[in-house]
Amino acid sequence: MNEKTRKNISAAGLLIAIGIVYGDIGTSPLYVMKSIVAGNGGIANVNRDFIVGSISLVLWTVTLLTTLQTVFIALKATNHGEGGIFALYTLVRKRAKWLVLPALIGGAAILADGTLTPAVTVTTAIEGLKGIEFGHGNVPVSTQGTVIAITVVILLLLFSIQRMGTSIIGKAFGPIMFIWFTFLGVIGLMNMMGDLSILQALNPYYAIKLLFSPYNKAGIFILGSIFLATTGAEALYSDVGHVGKGNIIGSWPYVFVCLSLNYFGQGVWILNNPNYNAGNGDFNPFFEIIPQNIRLAAIVLATIAAVIASQALITGSFTLVAEASGLKFLPRMNIMYPSTKKGQIYIPSVNKMICAATIAIVLFFQTSAHMEAAYGLSITISMLMTTILLYEWLAMKGVHTIWNWLFLIFFGFLDVMFMLASLSKFMHGGYVSLVIAGFIGIIMYVWYYGNKIRDKRESRNAYVRLDEYVDMLTNLSHDEDYPTFATNLVYMAKVKYNKFIKREILYSILDKRPKRARAYWFVTVNVTNEPFTAEYAVNTYGTKNVINVQLFLGFKQQTSVNVYLRQIVHDLIADGTIESQPQEYTTTPGRDVGDFSFVIVNDVISPQTQLRSYEKFLVEARVWLQNLSSNPASWFGLDYADTVIERVPLILGNQRRQHITRIPPKKFEDIKKKLQAEGELKE
């Protein structure tokens, strides 16, 4: 750990990291050993070699994939403090165009996992309540239906508090998760003391031996259950922008030790209870290692930890979606910043979609055992894609070719093995995660390549120099042959390099129907890295009625363009930059600012567009997604302003020329007589 990273570590930061980042991997003990034993036919079909080998596989999987690959390597690959597969892609995308594919596939897989993690963890924890007596023989949670109802209520509450932001949530969750990991370690240690020979699992020999052992009925496919122990490693990388690299590195050793002790404790309990019979068929060694007199309190704590586990994926999903939108993988969405840190975000639409998908999964699968079959597959895919991108990042950083290839071969082999093992769950529920990932991936593919085709095929004169049209706009402003469209005609249009603007904007003013206005405003909104910036700059091109406004707004500042622009007009009138706009008819005496009309231009594919059918489909699908997902008036704070949405033709590629020939009058008369004779034309 370098000096800079060490300085960024604080007690509060460590607590927030434990509360936000480790929830997913921290609840793995709830279901990993349960899944492993069930996959081998139950507790009656396991022996010492199987348990020691299984725990060895778990520990070394977490060591290699979480500690080595994620904490020691991936956390170094951050983009301005942000982590995750999209941030990694941003660092390496100039090395090869095809690298966009692993980024799209991996990102879609992680977002799909965000719907499964809350469902699995919360359901597993609540299932621990089944059969627990409250008072004198009262068993309120006796059926799976009750478990599902409680799970759905908890999930609804979880998603409803997301608007509070990760800072507030982390402060509340951090101490609880610290207690949770301490509890895992203490309970595990208490059981482990009954048979310290379980520490043989630290030797990787037993892990490799189990893969080829006749006692292992699942064979190599046992890795599908083993991999569940490291789900959540991707959250460490995705959430680095929320809590900081130093706090993740500083807190991981404690978390890893506590997890290891709990797995050891569960292993010893299984070895000491070979004839255990759950009676009702519900067997979970995690709850069995807990003394009966504190089991109810432990289940409550496990439920809270499960809720926090879901938080890691939800916050990670917000970060990934924001990055995807910036990379033009996804449409623009309304992003909110609950705190003064730009890395901590909340996206209402994403929150609603994940909530709906998670609850649907709970209602569809009904039990945690069924959900576990769907869990993990999408994450193995994302980890393989991350490995490919990390290989490119290491090469970019100048790592020796031999070491770089060793990294790719070693971790690529591990990822492929876990992915193949997880594919064995496909027909038992794994298809659900792939369907969700596929749906997200298709949207990303359409949006990204639709934009690429549009940019490539768009006419070279798509952008024009605004300053070359200043005289024309000034003349139109004073031309009384045209009715006044508005006193202030405002276009929400980006002006690049202070002079280039899309031709469609000027087409809207001059060609569709000349729009006469006293002043033409072209407004560009620039979001800064500071939370509360509110500044502007103007360029009038030497006129008093053509104004290019560059707004610089902090990421927490409301984008109320309507309000800001009125203040800007007052400022410019006061210093003589533009002329006063006195109003004869007004409810405000002395008002010197006229009315505003805001115009937002939307593209429509022109029939004249010449593209290959596949390209045209992608561009049309991209435009459809834009119209479905966007609300520009809301983005710019124009909900209650006079806003006009205009559609202009988007002509891509070579234009299709359609010719019509004029015929002489005599020929027309001959055609007319012929049609009348045939009865096709009546007098």
Curated annotation (Swiss-Prot):
Subcellular location(s) per record: Cell membrane
Cystines in this chain: none
Cellular component aspect of the GO annotation: plasma membrane
Major location (coarse): membrane
Topological category with respect to the lipid bilayer: Multi-pass membrane protein
Keywords (A to Z) from UniProt: Cell membrane, Ion transport, Membrane, Potassium, Potassium transport, Symport, Transmembrane, Transmembrane helix, Transport
InterPro entries: K+_transporter (IPR003855), K_trans_C (IPR053952), K_trans_N (IPR053951), Kup (IPR023051)
Family: Belongs to the HAK/KUP transporter (TC 2.A.72) family.
Cited PANTHER family: K+ POTASSIUM TRANSPORTER, OSMOTIC STRESS POTASSIUM TRANSPORTER
Entries under HAMAP family matching the protein: Kup
Physiological role: Transport of potassium into the cell. Likely operates as a K(+):H(+) symporter.
Name under which the protein is recorded: Probable potassium transport system protein Kup 1
